[in-house]
Amino acid sequence: DACSLNGICVNDDDVPALMARIQATDAIVFGSPVYIDNISGQMKVFFDRLADAIHYQQFAGKFGCAVATTAESGGDEVVAYLNHVLNYLGVVSVGGISVATGKNAGAVDASESAARALGKKLAGAVRDGYTDPAQEAILADNRAYFKSIVLENRDLRTESYERWVKMGWIT
């Protein structure tokens, strides 16, 4: 609760400035190298600091995608996890790409067209919108779960509560 009860975290770090920068963007791209079939430790620490943004769905309405690089294994699983975190944040993902570079010196160059296609898909989602019924159901379930947190803290977090009311998530 030290970083979420009143919206002010006891950790003196760059996360508030980073959150403001992310809020000002149209889209979010999460990327991580793969270490032992998982995201990097730094990415995990960053995600842990996003708990408040997750609970209050601060990035709802944005679009995103995921990118992972690996020597050999775990890339697809990391892409799936990064997209899962995007959904937790209220973000609709347009997909992801994993590049395994281990024994293929040309893997990065070979993946360029897929990466460009993903970027175009993300830009198109920002420009024209994008819906995915399966993700919309996940986002609705997440909001239903986090609604109790917003209601419980409405007197401490009036701005967040009012945003949820404005979005129609609390009636």
What name fits each language-model region?
Residues 7-92, 98:
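Helix-loop-strand module that forms the ligand-binding subsite of alpha/beta enzymes
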